[in-house]
Amino acid sequence: MKTLQVGDTIPAFETTDHLGQSVTQDDFHGKRVVLFFYPKANTPGCTAEACDLRDHYAELQAAGYSLYGVSADSEKKQKNFADKYDFPFPLLADESKTVIEGFGVWGPKKFMGKEYDGIHRMTFVIAADGTIERVIDKVKTKTHAAQILDQES
């Protein structure tokens, strides 16, 4: 697993969001983007993380960020997740793992003594020029917005 680092340029990609809209790296051009990767929609940690970002969405926008969530869930699962919790940001349905592998967040994990491949919960702050400004690899699901915003002051 070779995860993108600060200073790297984001890879080219094309996927769809929970509404079926096409999203590419070009949609990020000229914006500061928070791209958060989570293992699975509608699971406790992922729900806590996304709801915290939802609850602090206005603050994140005021700081100049556009938010996008990414998992390997289907468009339908992402839509159900977004609708259930009223998320104001797009959730990318990366079933082909193009974005996930491009950012280097797919790899071996351990849970309850078992090893398997999966998505590592990580967040990338992307500068307007498409380079990685910051990588958060120790995501605190219940206070993730604060982790992002604390670097602004």
Task: Briefly describe each language-model feature range.
Residues M1-S153:
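Chalcogenol-based redox active-site neighborhoods
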